[in-house]
Amino acid sequence: KYKLAAGKTAKSILISCGARLAPFDIQEVRDVTAYDELQLDTLGDKKTALFLIMSDTDATFNFLISMIYTQLFNLLCEKADDVYGGRLPVHVRCLIDEAANIGQIPNLEKLVATIRSREISACLVLQAQSQLKAIYKDNADTIIGNMDSRIFLGGSEPTTLKELNQALGKETIDTYNTSNTRGNSPSYGMNYQKLGKDLATVDELSVLDGSKCILQLRGVRPFKSDKYDLTQHPNYKYTSDCDKK
């Protein structure tokens, strides 16, 4: 098909291809992608930890992370169906921190809905929901809708706060109004009524205590909870935060 293209069209194809593949001109990138040493299809066979670490200030090579996740989901889904009868023997949990900075994972809106049945889950960590919408456009709502749980750790991004405020709904409060008139004909009155009030206003959410979080689980009303104190974890002593050596 390339050879059938007109001269100018063929040149445009070459220029576009060269621009997209430019990172592979770097020898280190070619070395990393020359052969497979990750064995992604084995992650669901036994307990394994795989760390994918990229620069949080330079997005040049973030596409590599996106490629890895795409291959990971495809390989594990195929293995779950073809080898294990639909479910991996060991649950694979993907903790995708700074999910907005790794580039777009193709068909993520479909994957998050289908990988769960194969014992695979994805946890997207974002600074704000608007980041997800900036990358996945209209599919962002589908991705969020397919998440069984959502945790708000705090923030001040207006769109996120407004959507959380609406999701929390309202509570019913009792109000009592009293009136007292003094003078020649004193009188006293009391009025009682029920009113609807936002469970948490946008204002209140923006100043959420740093030690608190709001958890939304499917089928359960949202609730406020304490954040887990990592320093109390039995393995905290093995982390670099505890031991600077």
Residues covered by each model-derived region:
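P-loop NTPase motor core of the ASCE superfamily
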Residues: K47-T48, K110-A113, Q131-K245
